[in-house]
């Protein structure tokens, strides 16, 4: 792997706080994308008492070459106790904002939308003051499943575009760029008040013009929030890094994104889709719906 520049170094966390979060997760037998996807910000987020919960099992039905989550063609059946365990964790961690994401479950007719709904309802029951963000897969373009999910009224609907159209066959071979864009179109049609959010990785060989094009495409479907971060190769068997993008370039994209109408652009080398996601609460106060 290419040698990482200094700006990608992360501070060592206070392991006592990290350990307490891990203890709760282990006690309740919950997965986090922080751990499963080897996120570089795990120390900072766990230290702050936050986590992005990964539902529907630790294994995915897709094998995207950039991702560190395990692949299984036929994952385990859904666990009906998972929503309640997740809600208990939210309460025990005293989370004001929670992010729930999932592996792709192409083996399920609704892509797992009903499990998202169950998790949202369980959290609302025992922690009604917590705002909820769902980071969802593309549901294979099943807009009825999307509508069912949005009936549960999460405050934020997040779906990552991940990369530019030219690189989709290499980076997201089982996904479709236009279908992912249409998800945002459908979401705003179904639930106009929902805050929509997306994220892309850079450093995979994309150009500045291509990144800007994705940003413009997202604004055309009324996406509200964007995250941009550096792709980091999880292991030698994953896609290699083509370039380490400078912090200055991330600032350029942030400024451009704000200029074309995003309510918020979080753009830096270590930004990940749910990094500092709790900041959306301030955004919701500034731009109420």
Curated annotation (Swiss-Prot):
InterPro entries cross-referenced by the UniProt entry: Aldolase_TIM, Elp3/MiaA/NifB-like_rSAM, Lipoyl_synth, rSAM
Subcellular location: Cytoplasm
Cofactors: [4Fe-4S] cluster
EC top class, as a word: transferase
Radical SAM core domain mapped to chain residues: 46-263
Pathway: Protein modification; protein lipoylation via endogenous pathway; protein N(6)-(lipoyl)lysine from octanoyl-[acyl-carrier-protein]: step 2/2
PROSITE patterns (UniProt xref): RADICAL_SAM (PS51918)
Binding site for [4Fe-4S] cluster 2: 60, 64, 67
GO cellular component labels: cytoplasm
GO molecular function: 4 iron, 4 sulfur cluster binding; lipoate synthase activity; metal ion binding; transferase activity
Protein name according to UniProt: Lipoyl synthase 1
Gene: lipA1
